[in-house]
Amino acid sequence: MRTMRSTLAVCTFLLALLTSDSAWAQDTAVQEAARRAEVIAHLPPEAAKVLFGREVAPTLGPAQAIGAYERGCLSGAVALPTDGPNWQVMRPSRNRAWGHPALITLLERVAAKLPSEADWPGLLVGDIAQPRGGPMLTGHGSHQIGLDADIWLTPMPGRRLSRPERDEISATAVVAADGMDIDPTSWTPQHRRLLETFAREPAVARIFVNAAIKRALCREAGADRAWLTKIRPWWGHNYHFHIRLSCPGGDPECRSQTPPPPGAGCGKELDWWFTEEALHPTPSLPGKPLRLTDLPRACAALAAPPTSQALSVRAGVQ
């Protein structure tokens, strides 16, 4: 009975955590630290997200994306520099600017051409992955193998933001309050061109956006609509979009998703996202937290056994 009550308490907490704030990605450093401490308090010390969440540096050696986007890890990660000519890393205190070199290289290259191709001054880059990938204490179900990245739907300003600003300011929502369409006061033609530029990259497998953004893109796209196939509607994503790369060649343990179905995705499959069922879904209880044994075997070597000292340190934000 005690075990059942304990399990129910954990599930109730995690459900509240998942449903209380649809804009969790905009949490400030203080809010993020509080969430992490609360999560750790409700999880067993051997939970995979606790073990990977406390790692502060990558492993040495060649890069390898191991496993699937939502169940894996990353060796040999590299960090996107905090500042670049056409990008700035946001929420740096989270220490989630690590990725597979294939993704980091793509972000730097696309950022460089956005001013001329999309009239977009530069990228504000959100979460990529932890230093060794793996499940995160807060936020994402994916972003585990260094091939996912969140990009803010806010253009880079004409100055360098301070570190406190990067941890505090919020991105701009481009979706109307009722979720039925974009907000015409914040959506611009440059947003479409930004998303199209990323979608035309061969290495990009999917781009997740709010369904209202997909609706706008379907309406605004020209005759060449092939790139719309990669634009996939998903809940949230009204402040940022989420790019996902296919598995790079030479990473034998990386598991790509099945490609999106053919077609622009602008028909009945998009209409469903504006039904009551999709707009106000009934929350489901989360499953049990992943353990190292739930991940590919190679991931066990990337996360050290739990210690009380490490858990205490990771309750804050690095």
What role is predicted for each listed range?
Residues 119-124, 145-149, 203, 237-241:
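Envelope-exposed proteins and targeting segments
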Residues 53, 106-138, 208-230:
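Extended, low-complexity, intrinsically disordered C-terminal regulatory tails
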Residues 27-71:
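Solvent-exposed N-terminal domain segments of exported/luminal and surface proteins
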Residues 56-125, 187-196, 201-204:
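Active-site acidic/histidine clusters and adjacent loop/turn architecture
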Residues 23-25:
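Boundary at the C-terminal end of the N-terminal hydrophobic targeting segment
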Residues 9-17:
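Hydrophobic helical h-region of N-terminal Sec-dependent signal peptides
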Residues 27-41, 161-318:
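Catalytic cores and adjacent binding grooves of peptidoglycan-active enzymes
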